[in-house]
């Protein structure tokens, strides 16, 4: 795990999917929530564990903050709760009762962990203990690796300029008035089975998530 790695250890437990059918069932339940419009945002729990997923959900906007309560979780070890990398997903939803009904119907386990909080603060509570994390400072630490790699690719001056300003660019989307959000607008069909005759390659400039 990432947690074990920063402690210079390998670790003794490996994240695993113990029930493939349950995993598929959970995935399909999440897809249904997305399709029916109940999911506002989401993040997988993987490298770095739940704490990384929570922080990365906050990193996208300077106005975000979370108040999280883990008191309802059976696990008592806060380190395991925060850093375990077993498969899971965090979702921000808009109707707790309807989401709970859908997950209950699918037989998928879930917990309601918290709500939006004060901008720039991630507050975590577990069995009488409270943890207060400063999102902007942790965002800088999180982005620093990208900055150090960017220095090798773009040079010190440009990389430093980006590092100083990356969090000052608010997340905004601007669509043309004619944009409908539908594939059919561009002559695309998600159910197409015949080749289109168009060949394309997507080349990533910045590499991938294996930089650790």
Question: Each PLM stretch: what is its role?
Answer:
Residues 1-83, 97-199, 207:
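Intein/HINT protein-splicing elements and their conserved insertion hotspots or analogous self-processing inserts
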Residues 90-94:
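Short hydrophobic/aromatic beta-strand micro-patches
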Residues 206-212:
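Short, intrinsically disordered, charge-balanced linker/junction segments flanking boundaries
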């Amino acid at each position: 795990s990432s947690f074990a790695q920063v402690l210079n250890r390998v670790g003794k437990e490996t994240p695993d999917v113990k029930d493939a059918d349950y995993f598929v069932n959970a995935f399909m339940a999440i897809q249904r929530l997305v399709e029916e419009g109940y999911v506002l945002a989401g993040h997988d729990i993987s490298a770095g564990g739940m704490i990384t997923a929570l922080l990365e959900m906050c990193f996208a906007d300077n106005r975000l903050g979370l108040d999280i309560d883990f008191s309802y979780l059976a696990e008592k070890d806060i380190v395991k709760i925060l850093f375990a990398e077993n498969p899971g997903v965090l979702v921000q939803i808009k109707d707790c009762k309807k989401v709970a009904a859908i997950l209950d119907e699918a037989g998928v386990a879930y917990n309601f962990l918290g709500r939006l909080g004060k901008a720039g603060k991630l507050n975590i509570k577990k069995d009488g203990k409270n943890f207060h994390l400063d999102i902007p400072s942790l965002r800088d630490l999180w982005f620093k690796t990208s900055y150090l790699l960017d220095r090798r690719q773009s040079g010190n001056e440009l990389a430093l300029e980006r590092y100083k300003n990356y969090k000052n660019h608010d997340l905004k989307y601007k669509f043309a008035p004619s944009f409908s959000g539908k594939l059919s607008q561009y002559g695309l069909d998600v159910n197409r089975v015949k080749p289109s005759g168009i060949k394309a390659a997507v080349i990533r400039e910045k590499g991938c998530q294996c930089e650790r």
